[in-house]
């Protein structure tokens, strides 16, 4: 009986491991990803984030402020040659330039990426997904000074009915003023995001806690060595009604 139990347990463990491996999107397990990117997978949870977004082959996706291109490569492979990824970046000659997306788009195998200016973005087909990670708070910086209702309504206008916006960001304490908190800590109160997005017409459609860290005191700037890479983060999904 004991041997049968051990055999059954080993078989079940093997099957679970196989299922877990199979559940990892090919875009994440792609051997062509840089080692510097895969080293961040443990904290950025790309497989879980892809599943949360619902991104699939053939989708038209807008990635707002792609930074170093960590998700840019993954998204490009996830949507495949029948999809298209638009990477919206700041002025390449400005202080906030993000050259990584253009460099990736020039590499073989990433021909489905088009780099566009964040303002104005120009013409593009209606989108299935808009994604921004660790950047929504930046739109509240006092030096940026944008009308968030206009921004969010702009996203609404370029999204297909039933399309989604995924926002991942560093959480601030409840009630934190958005501009001051963005300036000092580069964080945002998740409730502010919900309020702004629903005011633009979106419906809150779900959240993921895979990036949460309740041990984060929420009082240090995200670049502080004591918390960098370990901040409490929220992932929200908003849907445009059909």
Q: Where are the predicted features?
A:
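A short glycine-rich, Lys/Arg-flanked "PGG" loop and its adjoining helix->strand segment in the class I
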Residues: 76-77, 146-161
């Amino acid at each position: 009986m004991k041997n049968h139990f051990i055999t059954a347990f080993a078989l079940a463990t093997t099957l679970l491991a196989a299922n877990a491996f199979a559940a990892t999107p090919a875009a994440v397990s792609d051997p062509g990803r840089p080692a510097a990117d895969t080293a961040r997978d443990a904290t950025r949870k790309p497989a879980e984030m892809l599943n949360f977004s619902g991104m699939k082959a053939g989708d038209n996706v807008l990635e707002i402020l792609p930074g170093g291109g960590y998700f840019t490569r993954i998204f490009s492979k996830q949507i495949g040659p029948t999809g298209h990824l638009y990477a919206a970046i700041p002025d390449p000659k400005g202080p906030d330039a993000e050259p990584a997306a253009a460099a990736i788009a020039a590499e073989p195998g990433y021909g489905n990426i088009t780099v566009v200016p964040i303002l104005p973005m120009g013409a593009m087909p209606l989108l299935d997904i808009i994604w921004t990670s660790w950047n929504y708070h930046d739109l509240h910086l006092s030096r940026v000074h944008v009308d968030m209702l206009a921004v969010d309504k702009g996203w609404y206008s370029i999204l297909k009915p039933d399309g989604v916006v995924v926002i991942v960001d560093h959480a601030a304490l409840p009630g934190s003023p958005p501009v001051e908190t963005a300036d000092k800590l580069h964080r945002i109160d998740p409730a502010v995001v919900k309020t702004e997005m629903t005011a633009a017409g979106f419906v809150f459609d779900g959240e993921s806690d895979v990036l949460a860290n309740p041990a984060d005191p929420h009082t240090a700037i995200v670049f502080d060595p004591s918390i960098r890479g370990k901040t409490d983060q929220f992932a929200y999904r908003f849907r445009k009604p059909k």
